[in-house]
């Protein structure tokens, strides 16, 4: 998410440890732009479920604990949809939500496609290869193509596998 937000003009930091009023909190992403400082919670699911009220309440409680560190708004990013209860609660307490097709015409898929960013998770690759690519900072298909075969071999892929992954990433990009 940090890389996506950077493409949209945000300055970001990931996995930031902040001492809250009550306990130490790890913030998934801290994003800043135009004088706003967001505490972002990333909720990603491998199976098509929704992000619900519990996650929204949990995020807001964490925000209240660390608000004194200059955070202006909590923000939840998810690769799924939000439940109606989560939307209602978020609207009431001021949580920004970004998910699949939400907000309308500003959902995560719009943010990605508007910058030509296609996550490597859409490639047909096994988990081990995916994990290696992510560890190397290659999270978008264009990163894989730009890195080239030599870089993919450096991170542990065979020459054949590297060429296959690059070819598939090129097809996705178009």
Swiss-Prot record:
InterPro entries linked: AF1548-like_C, DNA_repair_Rad51/TF_NusA_a-hlx, Restrct_endonuc-II-like, Restrct_endonuc_IV_Mrr, tRNA_endonuc-like_dom_sf
GO biological process: DNA restriction-modification system
Pfam family, one: Mrr_cat
Molecular function GO labels: DNA binding; endonuclease activity; nucleotide binding
Identification of the protein by name: Uncharacterized protein AF_1548
Source organism phylogeny: Archaea, Methanobacteriati, Methanobacteriota, Archaeoglobi, Archaeoglobales
């Amino acid at each position: 998410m940090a890389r996506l937000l950077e493409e949209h003009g945000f300055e970001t930091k990931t996995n930031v440890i902040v001492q809250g009023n009550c306990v130490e909190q790890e913030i998934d992403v801290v994003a800043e732009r135009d004088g706003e400082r967001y505490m972002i919670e990333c909720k990603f699911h491998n199976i098509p479920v929704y992000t619900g009220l519990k996650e929204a309440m949990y995020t807001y409680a964490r925000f209240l604990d660390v608000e004194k560190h200059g955070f202006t708004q909590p923000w939840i990013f998810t690769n799924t949809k939000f439940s109606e209860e989560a939307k209602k609660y978020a609207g009431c307490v001021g949580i920004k939500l970004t998910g699949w097709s939400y907000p309308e015409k500003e959902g995560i898929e719009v943010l990605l496609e508007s910058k030509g960013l296609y996550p490597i998770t859409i490639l047909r690759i096994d988990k081990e290869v995916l994990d290696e690519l992510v560890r190397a900072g290659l999270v978008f298909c264009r990163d894989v193509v730009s890195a080239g075969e030599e870089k993919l071999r450096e991170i542990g892929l065979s020459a054949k596998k590297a060429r296959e992954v690059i070819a598939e990433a090129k097809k996705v990009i178009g």
